[in-house]
Amino acid sequence: MSCCKMEAPYPHAESDEKRIVFALDPKGDDAERDQYRLQLIPGRVLEMSRNDAANHQTLSGSIEQHTVEGWGAPFFHVKLAKEAAATLMQVHSEDHVEKSRKFVALSNTPLVPYTSRYPVVVYLPKDAELRYSIWCGGEQMQATTE
């Protein structure tokens, strides 16, 4: 990973939040603009029965992008629901006593611009985790009509 300096005056985390900061590897301005995207995947590790864990779980919430005034440095603010929504398939017939822990992600995780000029700064609830993916596309292709 690259080491970009955190020079912009990012806000402090609120008392019920934490701030996560990490750097992205430089890919070149053109490639970062045209080919790369960052997907922030916030969520929580929840304890649930084996039956619930076998179902698809999601959290509602949002990711809002903001900019440090006068700097142009982006940062993100995550809001997450406390309770997960889930499919309701009965998978195991036993009594649901056995518990497991499972990462449950925000249901809609948009792709945001990739930039190595500034650190990625994300504010999220203290009990949440942040995972991320980096997406890379190839050359643009032209669709043709028949």
Curated annotation (Swiss-Prot):
Sequence similarity: Belongs to the protease inhibitor I11 (ecotin) family.
Q: Which InterPro entries match?
A: Ecotin_sf, Prot_inh_ecotin
The record lists the lineage as: Eukaryota, Discoba, Euglenozoa, Kinetoplastea, Metakinetoplastina
Top-rank taxon: Eukaryota
Per its UniProt record, what PANTHER family does this chain match?
A: ECOTIN (PTHR35890:SF3), PTHR35890
Q: What is this protein called?
A: Ecotin-like protein 1
Q: Which cysteines are joined by disulfide bonds?
A: none
Q: Name one GO molecular function term.
A: serine-type endopeptidase inhibitor activity
